[in-house]
Amino acid sequence: MAAKWEKKDNNQGELTFEIAPDKIKEGLDKAFQRTKKNLAVPGFRKGRVPRQIFNQMYGEEALYQDALNIVLPEAYDAAIKEAGIEPVDQPQVDVESMDKDQPWVLKAVVTVKPDVKLGEYKGLSVTKQNTRVYQKDIDAEIEKQRQQQAELVLKEDEAAAKGDTVVIDFDGYVDGKQFDGGKADNYSLELGSNSFIPGFEDQLVGHKAGEDVDVKVTFPADYQAEDLRDKEATFKVTIHEVKEKQLPELDDEFAKDVDEDVDSLEELEAKTKDRLKEQKVTAAHDAIEDEAISEAVDNAEIAAVPEAMLKDDIDRQMDQYLANMQQQGIEPKMYFQLTGTTEDDLRKQFADGAEKRIKTNLVLEAVVEAEKIEPSEDEVAAEVKDLASQYGMEESAVRSALSDDMLKHDIAIKSAVDLIADSAKQDKKKDAEDDE
């Protein structure tokens, strides 16, 4: 009997399939070899009992469950391939029949990917993107570089102003008691940077080096340390130094300091314009891509996403995020302590976008099928080369880590994204256009 698939409600169905007698025999043989190793039968050394004696004493049926566990994975994989379905979680498998010398018949309750009915996905209307670089953009970028080149110079007997940097000792108290993280010595703080609790920096403006200041603040309601939220605190602050920024002149020498490949401020501005143009073009492409794909997803009819797919997506996002933290030397436990969050908080954060991510992928897969996108071997080889270069790996290592099917799937999805984005028409105006 060929595998038989019967679709039910809620993305589930019943898959009925058989395990052939020759495969059953292989499973029984392996099951017996495992079982007899620890079997002690009077008259035989441990692990040496003949198969015939075992069958007489216990019956061959005693091996059925172990044999089924051995042969089921291969039989199930073959059945889902024959039925042309894509399960999204582990099936619930029940035995229909296990008759001697007959195929074993099994029935699995399987959850599959939701059905997708594509709507319009080519030639979609998207917002027109402005990639023009204005002089104000160039000036702002040059000013940012100027700020980065600034030197901090001591202010002698002058009061601190916004934009100045103060070097301070501080010691915080809540209800007259010190608290963790509330004390530091020789701390450099730029006034106006808003890196401290609201109100802290403002109260240091107007004070000079050598002065002691009592700073009174209230911790925000969303402060990361829950025990300090909405609490009033007093920080005893000693100002050791007040420094102001000394900005370099906007001239050719400044340009050379910023970029050794230019000889003048004019050249720096031209190079900055080119770089900003490239950034705007990239940002515009990304915006068009995001809007077009989002519209294609909205246009599609998609059945409810199974819980198993949502859980799998959230797990994958969390694992990837925490792995990135570990690469930066931050273990998960330390991350949750530093952020004042829990694993459940992080799960909720990723849960918010899980359904959208899954539906997007489902639509892209449907586009791949509709457009009959089939990556070539040359495209696979190019993808392997790119990944090897990106991650500093040998190409052979990439091929070992990723199967051809995985590589072809990723390439096909990228092609579907390009098809949707490249065919989009920029004919929607932004709410407020820049007329400069």
Swiss-Prot record:
It comes from the Bacteria. NCBIfam families: tig. Consists of 3 domains; the N-terminus binds the ribosome, the middle domain has PPIase activity, while the C-terminus has intrinsic chaperone activity on its own. GO terms for biological process: 'de novo' cotranslational protein folding; cell division; chaperone-mediated protein folding; protein transport; protein unfolding. Its main location: cytoplasm. InterPro entries: PPIase_dom_sf, PPIase_FKBP_dom, Trig_fac, Trigger_fac_C, Trigger_fac_C_sf, Trigger_fac_ribosome-bd_bac, Trigger_fac_ribosome-bd_sf, Trigger_fact/SurA_dom_sf. It catalyses: [protein]-peptidylproline (omega=180) = [protein]-peptidylproline (omega=0). GO terms for cellular component: cytoplasm. Belongs to the FKBP-type PPIase family. Tig subfamily. Residues 163-248 form the PPIase FKBP-type domain. It is found in: Cytoplasm. GO terms for molecular function: peptidyl-prolyl cis-trans isomerase activity; protein folding chaperone; ribosome binding. Signal peptide: none annotated. Keywords: Cell cycle, Cell division, Chaperone, Cytoplasm, Isomerase, Rotamase. This is Trigger factor. It comes from Levilactobacillus brevis (strain ATCC 367 / BCRC 12310 / CIP 105137 / JCM 1170 / LMG 11437 / NCIMB 947 / NCTC 947).
